[in-house]
Amino acid sequence: MDQPAHAPLRLWVTRARPGAEATAARLVSMGHRPLISPLLAIRRLRPRLDLTGVGALAFTSRNGVAAFAALNPERALPVFAVGDATAETARQARFRDVRSAAGDVAALAALIIAEPVEGAVLMAGAREPAGDLPGALEAAGVQTRPAMVYAAFAASGGRGLTALRAGKLDGVLIHSPRAARRLTGAVGGGGLAHRSSA
């Protein structure tokens, strides 16, 4: 039997559920050993969504798509998605007209600006968004309507922190700036640098 080209890495997946499971499955398929221990937890909010005057939807994450889809049956409005994974989530939720910026918030803003929308762009996203999509769009004269459909809350990450402190990890996967801040706050900047250099 052939030996693997490399030893499996022990990797802490800090991503919130349910995305953490997909990341872990991919790591397993690559021969690694993931440890799921989220630093953030996603909670859907229940805002009243008024789509009057809305000409398109914008999503900066898969969580935004899932939360909006659970709140509202609208699927005919054009959807602008930050990346391919978010676009695929929108298609799976039965949105009919989905376009991917295949990038970041700046790329998403550029895509929306390049394809004029009649009416406002409703941005269904996090209570504390990572980027300033409304600012970029409004600077270009695009009407925006933010809708906070989910929030990320701190989770303990206890199992991951314990494994990190015990030197039982080869790496840590961080999926957002907020999770990175949470991790450095939990272990201290110097402690993280020391452990990650091992």
Kindly give the residue locations of the regions a language model identified.
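Signature of uroporphyrinogen-III synthase
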Residues: 1-198
